[in-house]
């Protein structure tokens, strides 16, 4: 089992230079790891174990298993609440009249592992776009200043290069910042879109699935209907047709056990809560980003928080002279440069922008 998750270890590696933020990393690191781990877990049980076992008289078990795996199994929604052993064999499994009773096919069953992996790819796309657009700019600008132990001459030279870079490229870096903001918006569109994608995949059951499970746990035992048994039944029906000795069509009703649904029901409960929380946090992050894009005062407060060692007047000078792109690059550098060196960089940059000589 540990080998199954071994391929996920590479995603846990931390980057030496930070080019985004914690919320962004929840999308392309935490969520991608979760989805790939779940996909591997389902795959290991699906293709190493036995994903379906069907029972029916007169039909070889291997044939029935293969047939029901390909053509999907079903339950009868109006048999979900019958008494097990008396009215129904299992929740949703009972006698039904073809054409009269509604049947619900569970076509998602064999596709769960592929869909989870596809979702992981979608969550990585905004990160891939930003990494491509960013082009290693922050890594190039850091120039080993993320270490507190730097030769004084090298430190002075690299600080001068940074100050000259900002002075030369002043007011030309807005597009760089806007591309990051676009990727943040894509994160939000992606997570909300995936909630509705999973709802479509599970035949309209996902958007209320988590809240239904919570409501189920709070209800009295005799009044409640298990939503997990409705969406992810462990026992289903499968109808097999074949020709009899006289050439007439014979119909056989079989019972199928779906062991993977024991895992699937837990996976999708977790994903419901994770996606809802992630979409709320990302929405709040977009409001925060809008505030920074529209409010110079907000940017000044954030820069002051990032460079607490720098005097107030230097922060105000930089905030007044810089546009959002310049502020964003400087703010990102603050995440990667040693605080003492960053304080000196802010001081030198403030002097440069004021037209003073840097000593």
From Swiss-Prot:
PANTHER family: INNEXIN (PTHR11893), INNEXIN INX2 (PTHR11893:SF41). The chain crosses the membrane at residues 23-43, 110-130, 181-201, 267-287. Structural components of the gap junctions. The gene is inx2. One of its GO terms (cellular component) is gap junction. The lineage of its organism: Eukaryota, Metazoa, Ecdysozoa, Arthropoda, Hexapoda. One of its GO terms (molecular function) is gap junction channel activity. Disulfide bonds: none annotated. It comes from Schistocerca americana (American grasshopper). This is Innexin inx2. Widespread expression in embryo, in anterior and posterior row of neural precursors, midline precursors and in epithelial sheet of stomodeum. The keyword Phosphoprotein does not apply. It is found in: Cell membrane; Cell junction, Gap junction. Residues 44-109, 202-266 are extracellular. The keyword Membrane applies. Residues 1-22, 131-180, 288-359 are cytoplasmic.
């Amino acid at each position: 089992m540990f080998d199954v998750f071994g391929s996920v270890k590479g995603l846990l590696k931390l980057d030496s230079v930070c080019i985004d933020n914690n919320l962004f990393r929840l999308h392309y690191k935490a969520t991608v790891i979760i989805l790939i781990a779940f996909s591997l877990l389902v795959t290991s049980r699906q293709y190493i174990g036995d994903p379906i076992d069907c029972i029916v008289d007169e039909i070889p078990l291997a044939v029935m298993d293969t047939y029901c795996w390909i053509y999907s199994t079903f339950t009868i929604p109006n048999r979900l609440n019958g008494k097990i052993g008396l009215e129904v064999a299992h929740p949703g499994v009972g006698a039904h009249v073809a054409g009269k009773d509604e049947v619900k096919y569970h076509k998602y069953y064999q596709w769960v592992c592929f869909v989870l992996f596809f979702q992981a790819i979608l969550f990585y796309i905004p990160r891939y776009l930003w990494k491509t657009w960013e082009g290693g700019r922050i890594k190039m600008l850091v120039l080993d200043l993320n270490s507190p132990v730097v030769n004084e001459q090298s430190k002075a030279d690299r600080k001068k290069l940074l100050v000259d870079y900002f002075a030369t490229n002043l007011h030309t870096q807005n597009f760089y910042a806007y591309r990051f903001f676009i990727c943040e918006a894509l994160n939000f569109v992606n997570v909300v879109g995936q909630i509705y994608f999973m709802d479509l995949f599970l035949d309209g059951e996902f958007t209320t699935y988590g809240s239904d499970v919570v409501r189920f746990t709070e209800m009295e035992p005799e009044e409640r209907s298990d939503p997990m048994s409705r969406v992810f039944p462990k026992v289903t029906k499968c109808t097999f047709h074949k020709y009899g000795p006289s050439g007439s069509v014979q119909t056989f009703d079989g019972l199928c056990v779906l062991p993977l649904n024991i895992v699937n029901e837990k996976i999708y409960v977790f994903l419901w809560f994770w996606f809802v929380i992630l979409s709320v946090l990302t929405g709040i992050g977009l409001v925060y980003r809008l505030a920074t894009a529209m409010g110079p005062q907000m940017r000044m407060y954030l820069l002051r928080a990032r460079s607490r060692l720098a005097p107030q007047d230097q922060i105000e000078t930089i905030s007044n002279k810089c546009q959002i792109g310049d502020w964003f690059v400087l703010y990102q550098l603050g995440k990667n440069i040693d605080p003492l060196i960053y304080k000196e960089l802010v001081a030198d940059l403030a002097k440069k922008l004021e037209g003073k000589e840097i000593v």
